[in-house]
Amino acid sequence: MTSRMPTVVPCLLGPTASGKTAAALALAARRPVEIISVDSALVYREMDIGTAKPTAEERAVAPHHLIDIVDPTDAYSAAQFRADTLRLTAEIHARGRLPLLVGGTMLYYKALTQGLNDLPAADAEVRATLDADAAREGWPALHARLAALDPVTAARLAPNDSQRIQRALEVFMLTGQTMSALLAAPVMQDDSAALWRFVPIALEPSERSVLHARIEKRFDAMLAGGFIDEVVKLRERGDLLPEMASMRCVGYRQVWEYLDGAVDYSTMRDKGVFATRQLCKRQLTWLRSMPERVVVDCCDPHATARVLEAIEALL
C-alpha cells in the first residue's frame, strides 16, 4: 500500500431534481473534469427520458462514465459500481483530470466508501426460479417463506417488496446463510479505496416543498417529452418483465402499470410523483447520516455557485 496522502475526490450527492447536473456542468466549464455517475438507473441503455439522463449536449461538455453501460435485462450491482468507480477514478487522475462523482444512489456511495459485505453475485437461474414461484404464489407468500428462514430481514421488508425479498431468498439459496447474518459479518477490507478521500457535497433542501414542486414539474415534463412512448418501446422488445430491476426504477413501474391498464393516466401520474418524492425522502435520510458531508441548500438561487465554492475549497 502506498504511503502517499489520499487524493481528494469531490462527490456531488443529492436527491432527484436538486440541481446536481447543473452544478457538475458548471464545474466542467472551469476545470478539466470527468464525471462518474452514481445512479443505478442511468446505467441502463434505452432508458433516457424517465431517468432524466444527461442529454448529448450535456455529455459533450465533459466525459461521462457509468451511463448506458448495461442492457435493461441485465443486473448491475453495488460491487460492480465500486470496482468500476475505483478503476475510473485512478484512470481519470492519471490523465491529469479531476474525477467528479455525481448522483443519488446512496447504496452505491456507501459501497464505495465503506466497503462491501461478502454477498454472492446475482444468479439468473435462482432468480428465474423465485420469479416463477412469485407468479404462482404471490410475493407475500415468498415474504412468509423468508420470515421462516430469516425473520430479521423479513421484519424490515414489506410483503410486496419483490426486489429485496428475492435478493434475500437468493442469498440464502446460494450460500445457506441468511442475509442478516452476512450483513452482520465484518466488511471485507481492501486498500484500493485508501488512495482516495471521497468527500460528499450534499445538495439538500431547506424547504422540502420547493423540491417537491420541482419533482412534480420534472415528472410532468417527462410525460410531455415522450416517457410513455419510451416504455412502450421497451415493452415491445418482448424480453423485459416488470419484476426486473430496470423496470422497477421509479416512473417506469408506474407507466408499465398504466400500459397494462391497471391504472388510469391521472393515477399513474400521481403515483409516479409520489414514488419520486418517496425516493427523495430516502435519499435525504441517507445523506443526513453522513456527518462528514458539506451541505449546500439546493433551494438557494445561488446553489450552483455555492457548490463550486465548496469543491474549490477542497482542492
UniProtKB/Swiss-Prot annotation:
SUPFAM superfamilies: P-loop containing nucleoside triphosphate hydrolases. One of its GO terms (biological process) is tRNA modification. It catalyses: adenosine(37) in tRNA + dimethylallyl diphosphate = N(6)-dimethylallyladenosine(37) in tRNA + diphosphate. The keyword Cell membrane does not apply. It holds the Pfam family IPPT. Its cofactor is Mg(2+). Substrate binds at T16, A17, S18, G19, K20, T21. Its EC number is 2.5.1.75. Transmembrane segments: none annotated. Keywords: ATP-binding, Magnesium, Nucleotide-binding, Transferase, tRNA processing. Monomer. Catalyzes the transfer of a dimethylallyl group onto the adenine at position 37 in tRNAs that read codons beginning with uridine, leading to the formation of N6-(dimethylallyl)adenosine (i(6)A). Belongs to the IPP transferase family. This is tRNA dimethylallyltransferase. It comes from Paraburkholderia phytofirmans (strain DSM 17436 / LMG 22146 / PsJN) (Burkholderia phytofirmans). The lineage of its organism: Bacteria, Pseudomonadati, Pseudomonadota, Betaproteobacteria, Burkholderiales. The gene is miaA.
